[in-house]
Amino acid sequence: DGCGLLLRKPDAFLRLAAAEAGIKLSGHYGVGMVFLNRDPALAAAARADLRAELAQEGLTVAGWRVVPINPDACGEESRKTLPHIEQVFVNPPADMLPEAMERHLFVARRRANQRIRARDPVYYVLSLSGRVIDYKGLVMPASLPEFYPDLDDERLESSICLFHQRFSTNTLPQWWLAQPFRYLAHNGEINTIRGNRNWAEARSYTFSSPLLPDMAKIRPLVNMTGSDSSSLDNMLEVLVMGGMDIFRAMRLLIPPAWQNIEHMDPDLRAFYEYNSMHIEPWDGPAGIVLTDGRYAGCVLDRNGLRPARYVITEDRHLTIASEIGVHDYAPEQVIAKGRMKPGEMLAVDVETGRLLTPADIDHDLKSRHPYRRWLRGH
């Protein structure tokens, strides 16, 4: 049912690829992976609409690059629905900060999606960001670098790599439903998905953020018909684009069983109790890996119903997977290894090289505001 890689943007490689395609990039830029219709007229219309929405957000399309692919790496059935795949490179104005560019890319992508997918369901933007890029499709894992020669190019380097192989249980295989999505990959099921989607839709008219002044542009906040994982990714993205960091957003969506942990730190309990008033848990068996391009991490559901094991090596590599042995390390290289516990979150900051343990993350979250006082006062 597909697989993929979500990478921290491999800047050096993408600049070389853009230059080879005659595309001039600014100091910071966005790049999108786009599934287009194989009908040239529909593909051209989609490009034009996406360009128009980007222009509305003050962004300029620097150019399009046809992504090299090898259809022979696909199975017979996946070749029947194989889309045309291109990368779009986007330059911001000189005075637009990278964080602002991310939000403008987000709004433009959402608006273009509303315009295009109603007439062309093949169209899909895998990622459109200045921080990450997503390579995925309906291929077997061993065939992914054969399908995408970019991934077999030694010039492509990244400090974050999220991999997922999908076995769908509630949707039919489709190119766009392969994982990872734009922020996360999910092993499990969201058993509360119908309620989560309905509440997200019902509350969308009360959500507000000064960073997203016109929320109507991005509704619906989550898709109502795709996989549960894709809807969870939608919700996480909305929270992050609205100004919430990835740690608080993820702990709102996938909290631990804080009500039943007898000896939980009172300040940490207050954090979860306060935030539980804003959004319901997206509950069910869940092992999630995620990244925003700076932080990469893993979180387990409150019951720990999906496995997650980690290995840390002396050359400062962190590997988290559902099984030990995904990557072969010599025993003398390993400085720490273990199993994540129910409700825990583990992460790394690749810009500082800091490992963020579950205790580090909890301490940061509980210390941001006087949650206990707020609860007593209200």
Place the predicted regions along the sequence by residue.
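Conserved short alpha-helical segments that host acidic/polar catalytic motifs at enzyme active sites
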Residues: D1-H378
